[in-house]
Amino acid sequence: MSYRKLGRTSSQRKAMLRDLTTDLIINERIETTETRAKELRSVVEKMITLGKRGDLHARRQAAAYIRNEVANEENNQDALQKLFSDIATRYEERQGGYTRIMKLGPRRGDGAPMAIIELV
């Protein structure tokens, strides 16, 4: 299995990817470094595929990974509910390729290449 280390221990890396995945599901567009965006893409694609499956086991697998954060204040919807009700239905006909990565310029502080990752 090939993945990027991202300069972190395995637990730190998993926690960071869980946070970024939850943020992308809630906001549908985030700005991060290019390598984080490329690593995040595979995780988010798997979560959306679980959402499209829609059965109880898929929901429990996604719930084990996605953080329990409120996605929508008006209807009190959390990130998991948004994944299964809004995002999964949007990509029902699409076979993969749910995200887009657009490169930005370098970050001002340290010159790290930045990118925007968003749901298509």
Swiss-Prot record:
Signal peptide: none annotated. One of its GO terms (molecular function) is structural constituent of ribosome. GO terms for cellular component: cytosolic large ribosomal subunit. It comes from the Bacteria. Belongs to the bacterial ribosomal protein bL17 family. Part of the 50S ribosomal subunit. Contacts protein L32. The gene is rplQ. GO terms for biological process: translation. This is Large ribosomal subunit protein bL17. NCBIfam families: L17. Keywords: Ribonucleoprotein, Ribosomal protein.
